[in-house]
């Protein structure tokens, strides 16, 4: 009610200006008529101001609520998006029929360059389905009765899905007969269950961790039963395919020198360092780096341990001789590059199981980390200057 008070003050200040007060004092008879008119006019203005202020407040309260989007509104937005995409493709000289979302993002970044750090604050042009949240259709009729019998559970889609899955489990347990003692195991390699966020997006409902875990347990129980094609298709709705990483490691072939000694060569990289390693099948554990013993080349103990770790992991200490050449980078990066090169060369003298153990231990995986560049206006890559008020 602060706004009406300010407005009332303005009205009263206009009525009691010095000129008005002087005229009223000269003509006392005019005071009565003026007072009646002033009361009537002022009451009207005050009531009007108060009424207007209350209505504005109510409108602001309603505007702050979550907005609901109808199907007609979404269709209109999609039509406008398609028209805008066609215009944007013509501006960029591209074919509108093959103008994908990646092309739209690239065109927007080119036409509207922005230096804002927050990407969500930059200009964008996305499909309405990605901007406006999904909403359910009307869940009750004109008489106010809900359509679904599980409406008052608060999670009708989730409990309806659980009801369907449990019905399939009961039906399969009823008809499997003599197969009750044996549980079928299916190969699910190459796919995964939906995560909780994906399931919530599918059901358009918020789920707890217990609800999600119970749903996954019920689906896993369904998979242990002898399922038909219909059940298999039903379960696949809640699985997503994943890219299978090849477990086969490229192994360098064994070579032989003039004396008939078997050896293997390989390369490794770490940051800007590049290393080549030659690992001999038999030896006494000598390691030379650029013609120098590794104890002299690497004075830091941590770098020496990096070089010895592949042999220590395979229990092959003092069984191989190694000759390495390395260039670029610092001592830590060179040690990492040599370790990767030696681990790859060792694969030629070990079994497939040992190669798999090395892969799982990370010995055959290159380290992609590099030094992060310094940012302008900062002391370093992440560190900021000390803030001073003046």
From Swiss-Prot:
Subcellular location field: Mitochondrion
An example Gene Ontology biological process: mitochondrial translation
Major place of residence: mitochondrion
Keyword presence, Transit peptide: yes
Transmembrane stretches, start-end: none
Keywords: Mitochondrion, Ribonucleoprotein, Ribosomal protein, Transit peptide
Database matches in Gene3D superfamilies: 3.30.230.10
One cellular-component annotation, GO: mitochondrial small ribosomal subunit
Region (Disordered) residue spans: 368-390
Pfam families membership: Ribosomal_S9
Molecular-function GO term, any one: structural constituent of ribosome
InterPro entries, per the entry: Ribosomal_Su5_D2-typ_SF, Ribosomal_uS9, Ribosomal_uS9_bac/plastid, Ribosomal_uS9_CS, Ribsml_uS5_D2-typ_fold_subgr
Subunit description: Component of the mitochondrial ribosome small subunit (28S) which comprises a 12S rRNA and about 30 distinct proteins.
Protein family membership: Belongs to the universal ribosomal protein uS9 family.
Protein name: Small ribosomal subunit protein uS9m
Native source organism of the sequence: Mus musculus
Lineage: Eukaryota, Metazoa, Chordata, Craniata, Vertebrata
């Amino acid at each position: 009610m602060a706004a009406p008070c300010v407005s009332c003050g303005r009205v009263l200040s206009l009525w009691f200006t010095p000129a008005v007060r002087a005229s009223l004092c000269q003509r006392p008879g005019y005071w009565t008529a003026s007072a009646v008119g002033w009361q009537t006019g002022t009451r009207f203005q005050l009531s009007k101001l108060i009424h207007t202020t209350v209505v504005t407040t109510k409108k602001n309260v309603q505007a702050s609520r979550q907005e609901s989007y109808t199907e007609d509104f979404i269709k209109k937005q999609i039509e406008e998006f398609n028209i805008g995409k066609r215009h944007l493709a013509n501006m960029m000289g591209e074919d509108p029929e093959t103008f994908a979302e990646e092309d739209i993002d690239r065109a927007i970044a080119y036409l509207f360059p922005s230096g804002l750090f927050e990407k969500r604050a930059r200009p964008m042009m996305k499909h309405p389905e990605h901007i406006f949240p999904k909403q359910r259709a009307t869940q009750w009729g004109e008489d106010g009765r809900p359509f679904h019998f599980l409406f008052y559970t608060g999670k009708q889609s989730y409990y309806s899905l659980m009801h369907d899955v449990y019905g399939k489990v009961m039906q399969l347990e009823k008809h499997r007969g003599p197969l009750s003692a044996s549980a079928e195991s299916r190969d699910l390699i190459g796919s995964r269950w939906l995560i909780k966020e994906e399931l919530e997006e599918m059901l358009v409902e918020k789920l707890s961790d217990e609800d999600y875990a119970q749903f996954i347990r019920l689906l896993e129980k369904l998979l242990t039963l002898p399922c038909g094609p219909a059940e298999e298709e039903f379960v696949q709705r809640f699985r997503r395919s994943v890219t299978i990483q090849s477990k086969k490691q490229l192994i360098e072939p064994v070579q032989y020198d003039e004396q008939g000694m078997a050896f293997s060569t390989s390369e490794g990289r770490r940051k800007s360092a590049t290393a080549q390693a030659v690992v001999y099948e038999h030896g006494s554990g000598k390691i030379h780096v650029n013609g120098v013993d590794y104890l002299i080349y690497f004075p830091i103990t941590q770098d020496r341990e990096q070089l010895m770790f592949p042999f220590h992991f395979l229990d092959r200490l003092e069984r191989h001789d190694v000759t390495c050449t390395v260039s670029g980078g610092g001592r830590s990066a060179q040690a990492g590059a040599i370790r990767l090169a030696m681990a790859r060369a060792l694969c030629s003298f070990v079994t497939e199981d040992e190669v798999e153990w090395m892969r799982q231990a990370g010995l055959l995986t290159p380290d992609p980390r590099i030094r992060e560049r310094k940012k302008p206006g900062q002391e370093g890559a992440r560190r900021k200057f000390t803030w001073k008020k003046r």
